[in-house]
């Protein structure tokens, strides 16, 4: 099955404020009917990068069988990690980067890799806040979640 996932993350007062993620999952079933699902969640204290990662994780974890996925994100952090093979280098170096510095958000990178594992995923960058309807909707989902009253604890903020 072919699936399209759109994602966005947001943080207020990055890195010490609340944040949220928004995800849209879209697919067309065997009868030609399009199905769209939306996901969002908010955290009390987090970072924008963590919310960008969570948006991708939630979309991939929602899939119940192996799929061919096109995942759109306005986060170059997420897209370049895969398309420019940053992750391969980080893993080879024991989750270190550059000057032997630890990679941030390792907990979420590992979770994203596990969620991606059973799928054929293509990561595509889309310019944020540029009128792309699904990206704009994900932004609304993310910011609404960040501003909501039912925020979870993000136990690892780096």
UniProtKB/Swiss-Prot annotation:
Source superkingdom: Bacteria
UniProt: Mg(2+) 1 binding residues: 8, 52, 74
Broad EC category: hydrolase
Catalysis: reaction(s): Endonucleolytic cleavage to 5'-phosphomonoester
InterPro entries: RNase_H, RNaseH-like_sf, RNaseH_domain, RNaseH_sf, RNaseHI
Key words of the record: Cytoplasm, Endonuclease, Hydrolase, Magnesium, Metal-binding, Nuclease
Cofactor(s) this protein cannot do without: Mg(2+)
Subcellular location, principal: cytoplasm
Binding site for Mg(2+) 2: 8, 139
Known partners and oligomeric status: Monomer.
Protein name: Ribonuclease H
